[in-house]
Amino acid sequence: MATTAGEQANYLQSADSMSDGRQHHPEEAGEKKQEEQKKSWGEWLQDLKIFIWNPEKKEVLGRDKKSWALILLFYFILYCFLAGLFALCIYGLLATISPYVPTYRDRVFPPGLTIRPQFNALYFSFNPSDRSTWSSHAESLNTFLEDYNDEIQQEKNLECTPGKYFFQPGEDHEERKACQFRRSLLKNCSGIEDPTFGFAQGKPCILLKMNRIVGYQAGSGIPIYVTCEILKADASYLGPVNFYPSDKFDLMYYPYYGKLTHVNYTSPLIAMQFTEVKNNQDINIQCKINGKDIISDHDKDRFLGRVAFTLHIG
């Protein structure tokens, strides 16, 4: 029994000491924390300097030269591999794509229409007696038609046979010839005899152009023609429309072989001159192309095969 009592006493004493030890640990942690908080800015700065460059261990940012050499070598190899993989993918992609002919053309829509001059929100308003309201449009048309000057066309392009396609077989990379479209063909809307393009007389000219599509055979053998109509108003407000050189896009300007090979190609134009538009009225006009395989009533694309604009002559 005595021995047992002694063992119990020793056990209680050791338990007390362990309890005292556990009670002292939080105090020691708190003291360490206070010591860290008591560090001055100078000490923090010194620690930072040591971290950046440790002269004793010869370390930069915690790494010696061997460690830095290994990690830089690793990233060099990694990025070289990624760059090579990227270059291989680009090469494979470019090897399957021709720069001359689009790869997929089975879902290409018929061409859209654009007009010149370009004006904001397709609302064209001017006063014939006020030059400032239309001079910029006349200048825009003159600049646009510079490539169509007769001298340039006769020097660079061929005089082709009207009414038939101008096929030019050969390799995709071979340069193709282009047919002449001389500026003088636009007559009253050429800007040659009348540099105001009819604006000064209240008889404005507007140019119509089809978008280019590589390989497209316009009209499937029958020339595409243009019609214009007034929307939501009396047809007499629009009056007659004169078309130059005609209301048709001649087949000899098709097919188009692409920008890289058809270098001197100039898109055929149709000039529309509105000679008897009712003044001081907003005239909503829609012009569209008509022909085989032409879509001009697409609900989601108002420029597919047609173009609508508002004309107001003050």
From Swiss-Prot:
What Pfam families does the database record attribute to this sequence? Na_K-ATPase
Q: Which residues are glycosylated?
A: 188, 264
Q: Which residue stretches does the UniProt record annotate as biased composition, category Polar residues?
A: 1-17
Extract the PROSITE patterns matched here: ATPASE_NA_K_BETA_2
Q: Summarize the PTM comment.
A: Glycosylated.
What name does UniProt use for this protein? Protein ATP1B4
Described by its record, this protein's role is as follows: This is the non-catalytic component of the active enzyme, which catalyzes the hydrolysis of ATP coupled with the exchange of Na(+) and K(+) ions across the plasma membrane.
Q: Which cysteines are joined by disulfide bonds?
A: 160-179, 189-205, 228-287
Give TM segment ranges. 70-90
User: What more does the entry say?
Assistant: Its function as a Na,K-ATPase beta-subunit will be lost in placental mammals.
Q: Which residues does UniProt call coiled coil?
A: none
Subunit structure comment from the entry? Composed of two subunits: alpha (catalytic) and beta (accessory).
Entry keyword set: Disulfide bond, Glycoprotein, Hydrogen ion transport, Ion transport, Membrane, Signal-anchor, Transmembrane, Transmembrane helix, Transport
